[in-house]
């Protein structure tokens, strides 16, 4: 599995301008030079996670690389990252009520033609809108309460036939390597695109049988390379047990259908993941289809579309998809406000679903003929005109006192409760946090999973969330408390002396022998 190396102790911050991407064209966007590109329009690439393009992507520096982020005021971003329970609860209750109402109507009208539109609505809410619930709760940003996110995520995972642990790690990889061939497991339309495959996806007739096959295979303990590449070894057993639970539930529904001599049970559980998938694909095809592969700029590989309020409810604002990929720590209900903050740095959004579909299908037709064809680039500010680390807070620069291993940080009133600040001690990156009870905590400044700068993250009392993959740490102990973060942060004791904050940094002597790693910007 292509995991980040172990990161312990302080991480060396670059002193120069933000690192440039591996290869930069005239707009400042990194692109991989496609080998063997000739005048021939047919160049078939390997989208496998263990194929030749995977090796090329890693060698080119695309794995967990630096992505462009639009400038935004850090205080405003902090407000936008705040999660609530009320709004997502209302949305969840309304969705479940509509689902239950459609299901009840479908049951009561069995044997009449009225049952057809009732099941159509039920399926769309189950196999279509359920995808948005799976996605938002999978990020852990919908609800403030972790248990609510996890409960909704697991329910929606079953509805979508997606094994929870496998798909959580798959989506983490998608955010790390969006549309990077050989690294992104969720490239829905591969080049050259098959228009027949696209059509069949509207009924889940391509991915659906594959997912059912994986559930059966995993339930019997057979784990293929795809799963082993994505999921850490210590989580593979969980994949097996989740598959067994899913298989047991599906077999139970199938047995009920056989016993009753009717397909009705399957129309309520199992088949909605197929006949309702048209709504999933109706929205999802607008996210990335036809856009550029192998670019480290979401503005080139992701699409934002303006849609009506009903669609935004069904889709949970994922039409603001560029914004979501740049700032995945922002909950879905704050994405419209985030869009207003950064839209000057983004390409013009598609004005409607029709506008988006015209672009998507024109691109698919052209790329079917010539895989190298690209959508003419919309205007975006060149990278050179926007400072790539403009969302980063200004670091407090301090040094350890000779012989003491201690560093003075500043007055005890340096931060208000709930605030955090980046600190650079002897050139290494750390983060100072103040919990709601007024206590200070001092930890490494770079995530142990995705090498993201934690000072760009979200502090909720004593829990610090990484801005890149939503992994979380308890700043009091350094413990990783939410995946994908697994390795703890190093922590350092902070004391108050004569109204001044002092941190003891003796552990830094051990850090000095460890490899230095540049703190990556996130996107």
How would you label these PLM feature ranges?
Residues 2, 8-12, 20-124, 133, ...:
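Non-catalytic, topology-defining segments of multipass membrane proteins
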Residues 130-140, 167-179, 283-290, 314-330, ...:
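Histidine-centered catalytic micro-motifs
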Residues 461-467, 480-489:
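Short cysteine/histidine-rich metal-coordination sites, predominantly Zn2+-binding motifs
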Residues 143-157, 336-341:
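Post-HEXXH active-site segment of zinc metalloproteases
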Residues 391-461, 475, 488-523:
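N-terminal pre-ligand scaffold of iron-sulfur
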Residues 124-134, 163, 167, 211-214, ...:
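Transmembrane alpha-helical segments that form the membrane-embedded catalytic/substrate-channel core
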Residues 227-234, 298-320:
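Active-site-proximal inter-transmembrane loops
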Residues 109-132, 151, 155-165, 273-277, ...:
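Membrane-embedded alpha-helical segments that form the functional core of polytopic membrane enzymes
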């Amino acid at each position: 599995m292509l995991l980040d190396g172990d990161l312990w102790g302080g991480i060396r911050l670059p002193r120069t301008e933000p690192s440039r991407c591996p290869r930069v064209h005239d707009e400042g966007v990194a692109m991989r030079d496609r080998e063997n590109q000739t005048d021939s329009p047919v160049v078939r690439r390997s989208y496998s996670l263990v194929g030749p393009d995977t090796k090329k992507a890693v060698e080119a520096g695309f794995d967990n690389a630096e992505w462009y982020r639009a400038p935004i005021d850090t205080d405003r971003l902090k407000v936008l990252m705040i999660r609530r329970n009320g709004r997502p609860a209302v949305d969840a209750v309304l969705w479940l009520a509509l689902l239950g109402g459609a299901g009840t109507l479908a049951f009561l009208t069995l044997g009449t033609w009225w049952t057809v539109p009732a099941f159509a609505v039920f399926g769309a809410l189950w196999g279509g809108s359920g995808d948005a619930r799976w996605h938002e709760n999978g990020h852990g940003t919908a609800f403030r309460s972790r248990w609510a996110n996890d409960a909704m995520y697991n329910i929606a995972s079953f509805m979508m036939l997606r094994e929870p642990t496998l798909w959580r790690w798959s989506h983490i990889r998608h955010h790390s390597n969006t549309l990077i061939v050989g690294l992104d497991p969720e490239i829905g339309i591969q080049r050259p695109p098959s228009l027949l495959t696209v059509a069949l996806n509207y009924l889940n007739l391509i991915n659906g049988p594959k997912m059912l096959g994986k559930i059966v295979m995993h339930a019997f303990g057979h784990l293929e390379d795809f799963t082993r590449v994505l999921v850490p070894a210590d989580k593979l057993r969980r994949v097996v047990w989740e598959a067994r639970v899913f298989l047991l539930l599906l077999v139970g529904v199938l047995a009920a259908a056989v016993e009753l001599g009717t397909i009705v049970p399957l129309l309520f559980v199992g088949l909605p993941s197929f006949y309702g998938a048209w709504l999933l694909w109706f929205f999802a095809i607008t996210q990335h289809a036809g856009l550029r592969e192998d670019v480290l700029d979401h503005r080139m590989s992701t699409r934002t579309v303006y849609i009506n309020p009903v669609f935004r409810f069904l889709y949970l604002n994922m039409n603001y998809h560029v914004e979501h990929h740049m700032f995945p720590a922002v909950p879905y209900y704050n994405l419209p406000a985030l869009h207003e903050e950064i839209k000057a740095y983004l390409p013009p959004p598609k004005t409607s679903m029709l506008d988006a579909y015209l672009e998507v299908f024109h691109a698919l037709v052209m790329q079917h003929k010539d895989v190298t064809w690209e959508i003419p680039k919309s205007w975006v500010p060149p990278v050179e005109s926007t400072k790539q680390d403009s969302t980063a807070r200004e670091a407090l620069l301090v040094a350890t006192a000779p012989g003491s291993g201690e560093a003075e940080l500043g007055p005890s009133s340096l931060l208000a409760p709930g605030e955090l600040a980046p600190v650079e001690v002897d050139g290494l990156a750390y983060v100072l946090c103040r919990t709601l009870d007024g206590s200070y905590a001092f930890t490494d400044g770079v995530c142990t999973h995705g090498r993201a700068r934690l000072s760009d993250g979200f502090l909720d009392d004593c829990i610090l969330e990484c801005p890149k993959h939503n992994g979380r740490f308890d700043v009091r102990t350094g413990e990783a408390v939410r995946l994908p973060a697994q390795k703890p942060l190093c922590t350092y004791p902070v004391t108050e002396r004569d109204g001044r904050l002092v941190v003891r940094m003796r552990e830094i002597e051990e850090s000095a022998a460890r490899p230095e790693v540049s703190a990556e910007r996130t996107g």
